[in-house]
Amino acid sequence: IPLSVNCWLDKGQIPGKYPTGGPVAKLMPVWKYAATSIDIYGPDIYIPAFLSTCDQYVKDGNPLYIAECATHSYAGIRELYVIGHYHGMCYSPFGFEDIGQPFTMMQGMLFGMDTSDELLKTPQNPEEYARINRYLTGLMPLLGAAYGSKRLQASISENGNEETLSFQAYDFKIAYESRFLSTKSGACLVLKMDANNFYVIVKDCAIAIKSTQDMLPYTDFLSVEEGHFEENGFVMERRLNGDEITTMAFEGVHLLKIKLFSYR
């Protein structure tokens, strides 16, 4: 059984003012040297610097294992990014049963309500979070098979207004600013099944897909289906066409099954 340890992060306080001595990023080499039986080191992330903290904890082959994190409005999109980008082993918002409830004063301090970012002050929408996790649960066997490969990638608005995910024959340009979107906070997870087939979980973003093939420079959709997973696989709820696939802008959380082709 793998042995893991998670820790309270340094928030700039004097050692002793918080639970000190754990495997914070700067002390991980010491822990790895002295505690060789520990397999996984994980951060409890309540600080606003979420992505840079994750980057620090995936060094030297350490898998990303987030045993605790906040339940503010970044919780859902960060879960998509942890799985799609870092191929994380664990993502566990603390006080899961209270998602969506107003923060107490203590939670507010832990979750970063002393910042100017409104999303850090706002509880995660529980319906949105449930939908994200239903889609991830349905995809789980396929996601696990893609861990450690470039077939599984993700984008998040915390990286900027635009981001490009490259999959050999296609580039997926993800945008979080659009006249079709009412928010600038979102994420996108893309799972490549084969050269032309993809599963995509979108949350408040727009997608533009381009061919990277010089001999086949143009791209179009053979099909774009929205749906969910059941025991026997993907179940289509509706097929998108017309203006829906011209704009490819999505508000809320959706699971898409996309089939592409390239031509000249």
Task: Indicate residue ranges for each PLM-predicted region.
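C-terminal beta-sandwich/jelly-roll accessory domains of carbohydrate-active enzymes
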Residues: 173-182, 196-264
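Aromatic-lined carbohydrate-recognition surfaces of secreted/lumenal glycan-active proteins
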Residues: 1-26, 42-43, 62-74
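Catalytic-core region of carbohydrate-active enzymes that cleave or remodel glycosidic bonds
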Residues: 29-131
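Residues in well-ordered beta-strands of folded domains
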Residues: 4, 92, 201
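Short loop/turn segments at secondary-structure transitions that flank enzyme active sites
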Residues: 9-11, 97, 206
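Extended amphipathic secondary-structure runs
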Residues: 1-7, 194, 198, 210
